[in-house]
Amino acid sequence: MNWYVRLLQKYPYRMAVTSTSSLFMIGDCVSQRYFSDKPYEPMRTARAGIYACAFAPAMTAWFRFLGQQQLPVIAKVAIDQAVFAPSSIGYYFSVMGLLEGKSPDTIWQSLKNQYWDTLKCGWMIWPAFQLFNFGIVPPNFRVLASNCCGLVWNTFLAYQNANKMEKGHVADLVIEEVKEEVKEVKQEVLAEVKVIKGFVKQ
């Protein structure tokens, strides 16, 4: 565990890219395996990994920026959900559309159909987790903690991106499963943080 802590401290952006891309690809694999009747598409998983490589540095920089602000935790979470969450969802659907070779008009239509439902779903999950993340998790491990929760969220994003849903429709079953998984992830991350703190003190 000590070696991982040292790598996080020495190469925060590289480690963020590695963990984020890995978990985005795993999330896509899970989405294809359990929420799709189509044959597995390796290129779809590869696109998820490529997107994550571009997204991870921005997420790391954002967490560092928020972590440096002398604000209450609740204020940091509010800013995160008012600024980063809406922009990151739009960025996801736009970049994935470009990687899939869609036209700008098609990407715009996908955003109109899926953006608001996805954002509302995110607001049911991420604020509570980010309160835990900014309030308890040490700064060096916040990206990793978000990625652990993000494994479930990425599965949902992959599902949303692959299914061109009508406006106003939300995958209720998927959302409930995501919320349950997030609860489990929070417990697991809290346990890991306690272990990591013990190693750091040594």
From Swiss-Prot:
Subcellular locations according to the entry: Mitochondrion inner membrane
Q: Name one GO biological process term.
A: ethanol metabolic process
Q: Establish whether keyword Flavoprotein is in the entry.
A: no
Entry keywords, A to Z: Membrane, Mitochondrion, Mitochondrion inner membrane, Transmembrane, Transmembrane helix
Q: Does the keyword Glycoprotein apply?
A: no
Q: What is the protein's membrane topology class?
A: Multi-pass membrane protein
Residue pairs linked by disulfide bridges in the UniProt entry: none
Which Gene Ontology cellular component terms are annotated? cytoplasm; mitochondrial inner membrane; mitochondrion
| Source species, domain of life | Eukaryota
Give the main localization category: mitochondrion
Query: Which parts of the chain span the membrane according to its record?
Result: 15-31, 48-66, 82-99, 143-159
The UniProt family comment states: Belongs to the peroxisomal membrane protein PXMP2/4 family.
What's this chain's function? May be involved in cellular response to stress. Required to maintain mitochondrial DNA (mtDNA) integrity and stability.
User: How is this protein named in the record?
Assistant: Protein SYM1
The scientific name of the source species is Yarrowia lipolytica (strain CLIB 122 / E 150) (Yeast)
